[in-house]
């Protein structure tokens, strides 16, 4: 039986070429593997348009490991971090800062509202002690896109440092670090680059990284030490996820051959457009307004029907070969459908047909939205 298609924001469906790259074993101290790491890091900085101002620090583990590493390394103990909060991944940053003992100020927004740059500036006026902003660029709990450029500009005007969780946007949406004033951008292998999970990375401004020595309370999650060792030896400090990096190298080769960010973003946008139009034809209503919807994952209102049960619905769609994501909102019954991975609009149309059949199997009659 073929593997199901993952309609999730990561892990996601990968190409056969990417999976095949993991068939080779690598020595973690071998020169060939060191060259592999260096080539991956160079491409990641180039994709971010970082130029010579920025370096890539790879980190073992999920993307959250790298988010915690960046916060723990780049924010000094007496720093104060403003966290615009419009979803679960913003809340996770607040939890990380709490565990690190770093003072944090939450700036709440609705789950269906993008962060407002003017509200961020107003927070600077109310709380002049703020030193940093930690922004989730694409809040995947709903699929909402936050205005990175406007917030980066506000931070520059007020002399605040900006750390960006670009976990679900990097590689698909345009981001240019050069002259942005952003201290760090964090993402991971298993998202829009279409690698496999297991490696995060921070693309960090050199001067911010140089100034961070001794900040981190963690040995393993110290970005400064990780990069210093990598620069000195070409090696990771601790055992690297060798097969993950090999898969990412293959995924990056395919990414560049496809046409880089513009082409990857266009394919995902086509997937998203096809998904929303086809789901509306079935009767499903997107949670977000189109003006703030990112082309990565779409949240839909669940059917308002007593026969609806997410587990039975999920199992029926899973049986047809597609894996969905549960909702992650606090106040509404929803589910999510991803638009990313090694998939195209044809896969999306087949998935929507499976969703329609699943709803029908539950005895739910829907009308076009």
Swiss-Prot record:
UniProt xrefs under Pfam families: Aminotran_5
Catalysed reaction, written as an equation: (2-aminoethyl)phosphonate + pyruvate = phosphonoacetaldehyde + L-alanine
List every position bearing N6-(pyridoxal phosphate)lysine.
191
Superkingdom in the source lineage: Bacteria
Required cofactor names: pyridoxal 5'-phosphate
Which principal EC class is assigned to this enzyme?
transferase
Query: Which Enzyme Commission number(s) are listed?
Result: 2.6.1.37
Q: Which GO terms describe its molecular function?
A: 2-aminoethylphosphonate-pyruvate transaminase activity
Keywords, in A-Z order = Aminotransferase, Pyridoxal phosphate, Pyruvate, Transferase
A GO biological process held by the record:
organic phosphonate catabolic process
Q: Does the record bear Transferase in its keywords? A: yes
Q: Which SUPFAM superfamilies match?
A: PLP-dependent transferases
InterPro entries in the record, alphabetically? Aminotrans_V_dom, NH2EtPonate_pyrv_transaminase, PyrdxlP-dep_Trfase, PyrdxlP-dep_Trfase_major, PyrdxlP-dep_Trfase_small, SP_NH2Trfase/AEP_transaminase
Q: How does it assemble?
A: Homodimer.
* The protein's role, per its UniProt record: Involved in phosphonate degradation.
- Membership in a protein family: Belongs to the class-V pyridoxal-phosphate-dependent aminotransferase family. PhnW subfamily.
What's the protein called, per UniProt? 2-aminoethylphosphonate--pyruvate transaminase
Q: What organism is the protein native to?
A: Burkholderia orbicola (strain AU 1054)
> Per UniProt, what is the name of the gene that codes for the protein in this document?
phnW
